[in-house]
UniProtKB/Swiss-Prot annotation:
It comes from Staurastrum punctulatum (Green alga). This is NAD(P)H-quinone oxidoreductase subunit 5, chloroplastic. It is an enzyme of class 7 (translocase). Its EC number is 7.1.1.-. The chain crosses the membrane at residues 9-29, 40-60, 67-87, 88-108, 124-144, 147-167, 185-205, 219-239, 258-278, 289-309, 327-347, 395-415, 427-447, 486-506, 535-555, 613-633, 649-669. NCBIfam families: NDH_I_L, PRK06590.1. It is a multi-pass membrane protein. GO terms for cellular component: chloroplast thylakoid membrane. The keyword Transmembrane helix applies. Belongs to the complex I subunit 5 family. GO terms for molecular function: NADH dehydrogenase (ubiquinone) activity; quinone binding. NDH is composed of at least 16 different subunits, 5 of which are encoded in the nucleus. It catalyses: a plastoquinone + NADH + (n+1) H(+)(in) = a plastoquinol + NAD(+) + n H(+)(out); a plastoquinone + NADPH + (n+1) H(+)(in) = a plastoquinol + NADP(+) + n H(+)(out).
């Protein structure tokens, strides 16, 4: 089976070729893009399908052999530096390949229905193919230079896709915000890469890990400098995976079409940061301060994301903050050294979140004919309610994703999240309790989203007062090519968690996920549990999840929302201590924890003030000097012009006098 490893480079090449074909088609047939829609979708899906088949082949080979294969070619070779290009096939890259290609296929099939009436249909498929190719190339990268190149391509594609509807001012601002915020992390990542090259003299992952460990053991490296370089490396994933304090771009990225929201939040951009931390974890584990920083950043992000999601009215923004929170869980697990558990939650969350985002897109698609095509209404849960009656398949699949994300057994995220909590309680109890409390908040806001959207009475007809071009029959179920991916993603959302179920019989473990996932050296793994031990340790997490769901049912359940108007239902303003608490929570959530306002008043306003200062300096000082020199030349020329009399004898007289004067001056000096 090692023969298939030699063709691993074809996996990112196929979607890259489809993007190239679509780009040539757009340039060659600008007036005929409508007739090329079916062909563009077929090409994109077919080429990514080839990549998916190769990915499954590599995945199966890793299950059987559990060995890494690296293929490297010389790229740039000089006396000072040697750069190589290649790809690595190991359990981490193989499972990420399967994740990216399967979610990517589902998103592309879904896109055919969701974007069917959009003028940028072909362009969107082009961006999707390029985005997928960039992520696949990042996953296969064998060194830091190569991974940085694909890292930047992923950021560029996210900029193009978030700002896909660039005619909307909000979308244009969102893509700029995402791009600029990620520049901060990318700059730190670049400095970290250069720092570790300075320390180890290599960009290769394996070489860096080996040399860095040797240098630490022999005290031949400045530990403080190594810590700074590691934190700079970590700054890249902090921005890309929307970790505090560089998380502010993620909710605004919802301005892009819903299919790209699913791809970004499940398998590409935000997953890239987790993947890079997992790849670099053997380096980070040599530095306990860095590991503690990763864990604290993760749990802080998890709690912050959960609190910000509590009162969101926009369906997609609520799910966006949920992604931010769950990524914090993954960072927490990696910071604790639980390599397998962090990756396990990455996988289970990816399928669950892809299902939820595509389900939200189905809801929005069904709401638009009723409430209008303004996203402020079609995505507002205040105008939803009772949609399960109109869209039963979407409602059932969305409920499956909700149960999984809340950690309700036996759905996928239950197994991974519960192991994260168990490891946190064992290694850093204070972080474990914070993560446990966050699990309760997760169940509350996810069931709040579900109840507001799918249960109770439909409130969308309120929009008729503001929009005359509405459909009085209510929402409708989406087309087959949109519903089919929801059903398909429901399967791994339910069953993939059993790969990590703790089935321990005697001393032989049948924990399938741990059997083949190779753990790099120095990783500290949690001990495996029996069914009884796991069930007992699961009671607190399941209990807090059920409690959060019950509170959401009491406040937002069908009985609470039935026959209540929109303002009364969602307005938290009440008198008394309870009202003050509710108002505080709502303001914290709706105003994004005041973090965006803080950034606007400090960094953004400060940067603009400095820019204005430089503008004034450039306009009045730099340009003033240049312009004044020109004016002096002009005035000088004008003044000497009047001294010209037009006689040659006068000019010769002035020349002779000047020459003798200069000779006399130099003679006196000597």
């Amino acid at each position: 089976m090692q023969l298939i490893d030699q063709y691993g480079w074809l996996i990112p090449l196929f979607p890259c070729l489809s993007a190239l074909i679509l780009g040539i088609g757009l340039l060659s047939f600008r007036r005929g893009t409508r007739s090329l829609r079916w062909a563009s979708a077929a090409i994109s899906i077919a080429f990514l399908g080839f990549s998916m088949m190769l990915s499954f082949g590599l995945f199966w080979d890793q299950i059987l052999n559990n060995s890494a294969h690296i293929y490297i070619w010389s790229w740039i070779t000089t006396e000072a530096v040697s750069l190589q290009i290649g790809y690595i096939i190991d359990p981490l890259s193989s499972i990420m390949l399967v994740l990216v290609t399967t979610v990517g296929i589902a998103v592309m099939i879904y896109t055919d229905g969701y974007m069917s009436h959009d003028q940028g249909y072909v362009r969107f498929f082009l961006y999707l193919s390029l985005f997928t190719a960039s992520m696949l190339g990042l996953v296969l990268s064998s060194n830091l230079v190569q991974i940085y190149a694909f890292w930047e391509l992923v950021g560029m594609c996210s900029y193009l896709l978030v700002g896909f509807w660039f005619s909307r001012p909000s979308a244009a601002a969102a893509c700029q915000k995402a791009f600029v915020t990620n520049r901060v992390g990318d700059f730190g990542l670049l400095l970290g890469i250069l720092g570790f090259y300075w320390i180890t003299g290599s960009f290769d992952f394996e070489t860096i890990t080996t040399r860095f460990s040797e240098l630490l053991n022999t005290n031949n490296v400045n530990v403080s400098f190594a810590i700074v370089c590691s934190l700079l490396l970590f700054l890249g994933p902090v921005a890309k995976s929307a970790q505090f304090p560089l998380h502010v771009w993620l909710p605004d990225a919802m301005e892009g079409p819903t299919p790209i929201s699913a791809l970004i939040h499940a398998a590409t951009m935000v997953a890239a940061g987790i993947f890079l931390v997992a790849r670099l974890l053997p380096i980070f584990q040599n530095l306990p301060i860095v590991m503690d920083t990763i864990a604290i950043t993760g749990v802080s992000t998890a709690l912050l994301g959960a609190t910000l999601a509590l009162a969101q009215r926009d369906l997609k923004r609520g799910l966006a903050y949920s992604t931010m929170s769950q990524l914090g869980y993954m960072m927490l697990a990696l910071g604790l050294g639980s390599y397998k558990v962090g990756l396990f939650h990455l996988i289970t969350h990816a399928y669950s979140k892809a299902l939820l985002f595509l389900g939200s897109g189905s809801v929005i698609h069904g709401m638009e004919p009723t409430v209008g095509y303004n996203p402020n209404k079609s995505q507002d849960m205040g105008y939803m309610g009772g949609i399960r009656k109109y869209m039963p398949v979407t409602g059932i699949t969305f409920l499956i994703g909700t149960l999984s994300l809340c950690g309700i057994p036996p759905f996928a995220c239950f197994w991974s999240k519960d192991e994260i909590l168990a490891n946190a309680w064992e290694k850093m109890p204070i972080l474990g309790w914070i993560a446990w409390f966050t699990a309760g908040l997760t169940a509350f806001y996810m069931f709040r989203i579900y109840f507001l959207t799918f249960e109770g009475d439909f409130r969308g007809f309120i929009a008729k007062k503001d929009n005359k071009n509405t459909n009085k029959s209510g929402p409708h179920e989406s087309s087959v090519n949109m519903v089919a991916p929801l059903v398909a993603l429901s399967v791994p959302t339910i069953f993939i968690g059993f790969l990590g179920a703790p089935l321990v019989l005697g001393e032989t473990s049948s924990l399938l996920f741990s059997k083949w996932l190779h753990v790099p050296d120095l990783h500290i793994e949690a001990s495996e549990l029996t069914w009884t031990e796991f069930a007992l340790e699961s009671l607190p997490s399941v209990g807090i999840a059920v409690t959060g769901a019950c509170i959401a049912w009491i406040i937002y359940g069908p009985h609470a929302s039935r026959n209540r108007n929109l303002v009364e239902f969602l307005d938290p303003s009440k008198k008394g201590i309870l009202g003050v608490i509710l108002n505080t929570i709502y303001n914290w959530s709706l105003r994004r924890g005041y973090i965006d306002e803080l950034y606007n008043k400090t960094f953004i306003s400060g940067t603009r003030n400095i820019a204005n200062l430089f503008f004034v300096f450039d306009q009045w000082v730099i340009d003033g000097v240049v312009n004044n020199i020109g004016l002096l030349s002009l005035f000088g020329g004008e003044s000497t012009r009047y001294g010209e009399v037009g006689r040659t004898t006068a000019y010769l007289f002035v020349l002779v006098i000047t020459t003798f004067s200069l000779f006399g001056f130099f003679f006196i000096l000597q």
